[in-house]
Amino acid sequence: MRSAEGELDGQVLAERRLIRSLFEYRDAMLKAMIIGLALVLAWWTWASWGDIQIDCGRELYVPMEILRGRLLYRDIWYPYGPLMPYIEAALLATFGPHLLVFYAFGLITTIGCALLLYRIGAMLQQPVVGFTAALGLLLQGFAPNFMNFIFPYSYAASFALFLALLCALLVLRHIVHGGSSALVIAGVAAGLTLLCKPEIGEACYAILAGATLLDALAQRSALVLIRKAVTWLPGLIIAAAIYAWFVLNLSPALVLENWIGPPGPYFFRRQGRYLYGNAGFRFDPIEVGILVAAAMLSVGLWYGIARALRSRSGRMWLAAGVGLQISLARVIPPFTGRLPFGAQLLGLLQSMLFYPKSMFFIGLMAWLAAIYRLVESPRDRLALALAAYHLFAISCALRVFTQIVPFGYAIFYAPPLFLSFLLCLAEVVDHADVAVNANRPNAVNVIMTAEVLMLLFILFPGPSERTAKFTTSWGSIYVTPEEARVGRQITEFILNQKQERQRVVVLPEGPMFYAITETEAPDRWYTFLPGFRSPDQQRDYVSDLRRANPKYVVLTDRSFQEYGTPRFGVDFDQIVYRWILSHYHVINEFGQFEAGGGSGGLAALVYERND
């Protein structure tokens, strides 16, 4: 008898080992697919990321200035937290000044973000949900412009997202599996996120505080609240100490003067509302009402689709619908344009179902549903984890909550929310399966497959117009032929004047040219963005120009439409521009210069000092 029982126990153990190995194999395979897709996207879009004029040059110039002994904020203007420039400086000191260093760092960060999203999705639902979220992030992260993850407008944004996802994963692991060490590391990750992008750091503290408070309420224990808060507070103390060092050694006004974010500085009063509103941080009651209605409609449509999946004909209709959208989006786009409102209808379907613009409010509904579930079952750890994660996702996306789109500024804030949407979608399918007795895992797999196909065909980067290689001392970047030609002209001009020991200033924005020619701006303002300098600060800059006495000024036709004031010298910083016109004269033109960016690319006028 014992022999039979032992044989049965051995068989059960063998089956468990087999099941575990199958799960581990699936997990390893999905991770390998994520890494493989990232490498394919990197190969397909190689070196076509970033911009040689807008923002990206700051990521090269600022760490080089730090290595020259300059102090952030005091000697170099920088609009975000202090951590990323010093990491970049350490990378340059270790590996040397080369774009490959930044490309590699960006690629590693991107893969890290995707794997973290995958792990969170697999923990809260099932691996296919996490895989779909990871794929969405990857397809957004390799865009051939400066809104990408490989060579972005700011590595502070992409690295902050990585740290925030790490924090979220550790908090969720603590909720589900227990252990205080995960919470300690999560607190440190949250503090580091605050030192990169404070608004993303706030989302970290939303999940930390939310999870702590909800757990304490569920257990009805003030001791739990105090003990867990003390566990993750060291990270906040580290961040506060570093910020305090800058504030005490400089001044609060000087530090705030650098930042784009907080209310108070001159920039916020002049440009903040337009810039933030344009990015999606706006409160229009009518727009919010439309988005709430769209969120409910989107969830309702997916519920109907999930119910239809109980039959083979329903699955065939879903496949046909996805195939039609793919055809209209990629295979026969000219046909779409000839249809009455064809492109608009296609965009509406995509933004209602596969990447809803109303995703913030879907996430909000998912959070409220998780709170309700937690109230009904206070000891349900999965409900607590879902409530904590949805709070994190909507907090992270608050900066762009009315403009949730799979491109542009939103890609640094919306990936956690996209996973929140997928989790909600899986819950909707679950509820529909219960209602119609369908096979839930199969239904989730079918819908996630449809989501993956649509993401691939909508977001996979097409052929780029960036066909010309712009080669510098830092390596190469692909840009448009005109940008490459003008970029070479500007670079060669600065290098020639450097040999003659003549100083060249690039305005209003072009820090990459300072970096690749190993020259410096005349003072801490290496970039002129609308609204950052008050009239008094403009006069101070003019005084610095007089002291530096540059022989030449290269004035590009950079347009600042995103700020609502596109033209340097006309819409902003008129004092500086008038001084240049009165002390310099035009001697050359690179490209076809049109004030305010009319050239559509890169063009510049060369001014020489009136001696």
What residue spans do the PLM features occupy?
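Extracytoplasmic catalytic/substrate-binding loops of multi-pass membrane glycan-assembly enzymes
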Residues: 47-62, 73-90, 97-100, 250, ...
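Short periplasmic/luminal acceptor-recognition loop of GT-C membrane glycosyltransferases, typified by
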Residues: 79, 463-532, 541-546, 550-562, ...
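Aromatic- and kink-enriched transmembrane "portal" helix at the membrane-lumen/periplasm boundary
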Residues: 99, 113, 135-161, 170, ...
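Transmembrane-helix signature of polytopic, membrane-embedded enzymes
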Residues: 117-145, 161-162, 177-185
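Short hydrophobic alpha-helices at membrane interfaces in multi-pass membrane enzymes
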Residues: 170-192, 221-234, 313-322, 380-392
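Hydrophobic/aromatic-rich transmembrane helices and adjacent perimembrane loops
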Residues: 202, 341-366, 402-439
